Curated annotation (Swiss-Prot):
Oligomer status and interactors: Monomer.
NCBIfam families assigned to the protein according to its UniProt record, in alphabetical order: bla_Bc_2, bla_class_B_core, bla_subclass_B1
Cell compartment(s), UniProt: Periplasm
PANTHER family, sorted: ACYL-COENZYME A THIOESTERASE MBLAC2 (PTHR42951:SF4), METALLO-BETA-LACTAMASE DOMAIN-CONTAINING (PTHR42951)
Activity control: Inhibited by chelating agents such as EDTA.
Enzyme Commission number(s): 3.5.2.6
Recorded family membership: Belongs to the metallo-beta-lactamase superfamily. Class-B beta-lactamase family.
Residue numbers binding Zn(2+) 2: D119, C197, H239
GO cellular component: periplasmic space
Coiled coil: none
Gene3D superfamilies xrefs: Ribonuclease Z/Hydroxyacylglutathione hydrolase-like
Name listed for the protein in its UniProt record: Metallo-beta-lactamase type 2
Length: 256
């Protein structure tokens, strides 16, 4: 999220088939992927298909008086639905859960929280009320409590390998960056990285909200992600359009 906020374009559109294009100067990558996008009636929540079992969820929240879209993932597993990140608040999170449960005819069983800012953790009360397991690092749980949120489980280590039905998931803490607790989520079967707010979109012109950032350590953390995941297919940033590993390189450029 931002203090000096860029106006970000919503990375979804009306129900139908829509292309998204990612162009990053750091690499040659210019990618167009056709995918289904489903929106709620008010346009505040959208889910965008990356493949059969992985969708991006995007909610429009407000920061410093401006509408800002925030991304997470919906994982359609054989044992239920798993979200990467909740949403800005309980109302949006509740509607998101109801939307995906209706779409996939499965319950949301688990959520992975990537850091303790409102756009990730704002729906913790709703998750607790619904008996949904909210996984996080111990540091994120500590910061959540400090910031007045319900605490997630705090069960994730620096590297944690999880399996939800037929879906393998790895969480990785690469070091400090956007926040001291930011993690990324890796889907090895699909080579998809959920970069959260550690990774900037192609349209980002600056680092955005650095109130809780560790700018001097951010580059090292991005490099740690690049070293660990050399075969990235798609990258989902915390805000803005989906791209490829070039988004990591673009983030490094912004940090120079």
């Amino acid at each position: 999220m931002k203090n000096t906020l860029l106006k970000l374009g919503v990375c979804v559109s009306l129900l139908g088939i829509t292309p998204f294009v990612s162009t990053i100067s750091s690499v040659q990558a210019e990618r167009t992927v056709e995918h289904k996008v489903i929106k709620n009636e008010t346009g505040t929540i959208s889910i965008s298909q990356l493949n059969k079992n992985v969708w991006v969820h995007t909610e429009l929240g407000y920061f410093s008086g401006e509408a800002v879209p925030s991304n997470g993932l919906v994982l359609n597993t054989s044992k239920g639905l798993v979200l990467v990140d909740s949403s800005w608040d309980d109302k949006l999170t509740k509607e998101l859960i109801e939307m995906v449960e209706k779409k996939f005819k499965k319950r949301v069983t688990d959520v992975i929280i990537t850091h303790a800012h409102a756009d990730r953790i704002g729906g913790m009360k709703t998750l607790k009320e619904r008996g949904i397991k909210a996984h996080s690092t111990a540091l994120t749980a500590e910061l959540a409590k400090k910031n007045g949120y319900e605490e997630p489980l705090g069960d994730l280590q620096s590297v944690t390998n999880l399996k939800f039905g037929n879906m393998k998931v790895e969480t990785f803490y690469p070091g400090k960056g956007h926040t001291e607790d930011n993690i990324v989520v890796w889907l090895p079967q699909y080579q998809i990285l959920a970069g959260g707010c550690l990774v900037k979109s192609a349209s980002s012109k600056d680092l955005g909200n650095v109130a809780d950032a560790y700018v001097n350590e951010w580059s090292t953390s991005i490099e740690n992600v690049l070293k660990r995941y050399g075969n990235i297919n798609l990258v989902v940033p915390g805000h803005g359009e989906v791209g490829d590993r070039g988004l990591l390189l673009h983030t490094l450029d912004l940090l120079k």
